[in-house]
């Protein structure tokens, strides 16, 4: 099976659509297919830069695209629900059992409240997911109704993820409009996620660094 196959899987796409609708009603930022594609492509890019085989890169793409399907059931423990759903969906394909388990484990371990990197594929997925901080993820609504999650994402005016393979450094560089969100608010929401990225980078034999408005903060 391929990444293209899973992107065209009706059940996967309906789960993503329903999950994003659920999260919208609960007040969460965008978790649409656009987010999942971005996570898949970032995870693949990370592994490619560090010289992993194409087979592993493809598994990371698949896991990245599917990682949020559990939101269709419930936001709480969505990573584990997603893993269970993915396990059944992937049985439809000519995928080896070890590869299926690898994808399921990556999905099941991507949430900072319950998981952590267990192999390079899960590590790349985590970094791809947690570094997707951008203004366009905020749903359209009056700014007066923004909660702290909305403000933090809306305040990010520029985001770049850089990979230095020679020095083995993965760096997230953010520009934050502090008139919208203070640095304290940013770290109140994202510190645990950034620490998860640090653990994921370590799994890849690299160091994770975070820079905000030109200042090194992690």
Model-based region annotation:
Residues 24-25, 49-163:
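Divalent metal-dependent catalytic cores for phosphoryl transfer on phosphate-bearing substrates
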Residues 28-31, 116, 189:
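Non-transmembrane, amphipathic alpha-helical segments
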Residues 132-218:
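Terminal helices and disordered tails flanking the catalytic cores of nucleotide-processing hydrolases
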Residues 43, 124, 197:
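Aromatic/hydrophobic pocket-lining residues that form π-stacking "cages" and hydrophobic walls in ligand
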Residues 1-78:
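Acidic/His-rich, divalent-metal-binding segments that scaffold phosphate/diphosphate chemistry
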